[in-house]
Amino acid sequence: MTDKLIGFYDPVRMKAERKTSETEIKLEMNLRGTGQYQFDTEIPFFEHMLSHISKHGLIDLNLWLRGDIEIDCHHSVEDTAILMGTTIHKQLGDKAGIFRYGHFTLTMDEVLTTVAVDLGGRYFFKYTGPELTGKFGIYDAELSLEFLQKLALNAKMNLHVVVHYGDNKHHVHESIFKALGKALRMAIAQDSAAAGAIPSTKGVLE
């Protein structure tokens, strides 16, 4: 397995690659973008969900992915989350001047979902809501929780997802990924009042 981060910390754009016996991924991400995205993953529903993070988080995302989808999509989704999370963490650098925290409550027809994040350098993930089961094309619905957990772990962030109510599984998924984009946008944004300070009384964030 090889992970390669190109440009280690680049406030404009970061490129990263990951290659294992199960997947090969090329990623380009700009956390302070305009919500532009381009995907080539062979997993249409996954692309649909990632587009919501990009559009609502104003994160430019260019992703090329090839994985062992003849088995299932697990490795492809998991490894993408690992690479995206690692890239988020590295691109934020010392996190000076960012808000650090973000949360958003989003409605998607009959569904109401809240997502809250803390980019403070510590991992925690909690999902509360209906069981995610079934399939969207070749994508197993339960993989969304795998994606979120691995994203939080590798971005070193707290991520709480609460689906308050609603049972249309497509709407539930859309609400989660859209709210995640919105919450990340808030947390990543520069706090002008902070004057570039580290958002922690410790004076440092990992």
From Swiss-Prot:
SUPFAM superfamilies: Ribosomal protein S5 domain 2-like. Signal peptide: none annotated. The keyword Zinc-finger does not apply. It catalyses: D-erythro-1-(imidazol-4-yl)glycerol 3-phosphate = 3-(imidazol-4-yl)-2-oxopropyl phosphate + H2O. CDD domains: IGPD. Gene3D superfamilies: Imidazole glycerol phosphate dehydratase, domain 1 (3.30.230.40). One of its GO terms (molecular function) is imidazoleglycerol-phosphate dehydratase activity. PROSITE patterns: IGP_DEHYDRATASE_1, IGP_DEHYDRATASE_2. It is found in: Cytoplasm. Its main location: cytoplasm. Pfam families: IGPD. Keywords: Amino-acid biosynthesis, Cytoplasm, Histidine biosynthesis, Lyase. Pathway: Amino-acid biosynthesis; L-histidine biosynthesis; L-histidine from 5-phospho-alpha-D-ribose 1-diphosphate: step 6/9. Its EC number is 4.2.1.19. GO terms for cellular component: cytoplasm. InterPro entries: IGPD_sf, ImidazoleglycerolP_deHydtase, ImidazoleglycerP_deHydtase_CS, Ribosomal_Su5_D2-typ_SF. GO terms for biological process: L-histidine biosynthetic process. Belongs to the imidazoleglycerol-phosphate dehydratase family. This is Imidazoleglycerol-phosphate dehydratase. It comes from Leptospira interrogans serogroup Icterohaemorrhagiae serovar Lai (strain 56601). The lineage of its organism: Bacteria, Pseudomonadati, Spirochaetota, Spirochaetia, Leptospirales.
